[in-house]
């Protein structure tokens, strides 16, 4: 996600990177109504990568106050240049980077390019690993579960973002198991990541299935209050990986991702969604209702 970078006293780190949906699976496989759209989780990854440019010795411990303000669309499958800004300031024993992702383009009636801010957030950087958090590894479902084919019969995600292998209800939570193996989501495929964006995506989709099953509506990401990552483990979790999402208020979810040993490798608190107009397709409703309504 990092292209050319400049540093200044007033603007901090500013990165310009050009992305092409023809080349990048995370765009080609993330289309809404046929148009590639930058996944919110890759915007978060861009924040993390930009924030660490000035303090590469520190780890990304979390990202707070993420706002998905406007989608980044790649019309006609054409490449676009993104501008990622990170202003890094001391914060206790670490640093905080105030980040934004924007684009510039010419619009009718204007003589100069107009800037749109799409995403904002704050990256938390530190040397000390967070205290280990344990969670319960979900048991195998005893009630109906949705298969990947059923999930992606109505979810718009292409192969690289089909992160749900199966999903079911457990009490008052939505549970999903991570697809294994995942196919490459970026080019080059071995380019390092900071925050395991597809584990965050697993949380988004797990919460979305709960809403779709109970409310008959699809929803898109709107905000994340707090996201926490275990450095190292989040990028290489052990064994079978599950996401467990709990709705704590209408359209507001907390979610954890646990590995096979029960370690919480990713935690999202206060993930908020915005519903799309129109109901879930009728063909998918029966499987959703059988799984999540009881």
Ranges and model annotations:
Residues 1-294:
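Acyl-thioester-processing domains in fatty-acid/polyketide/NRPS systems
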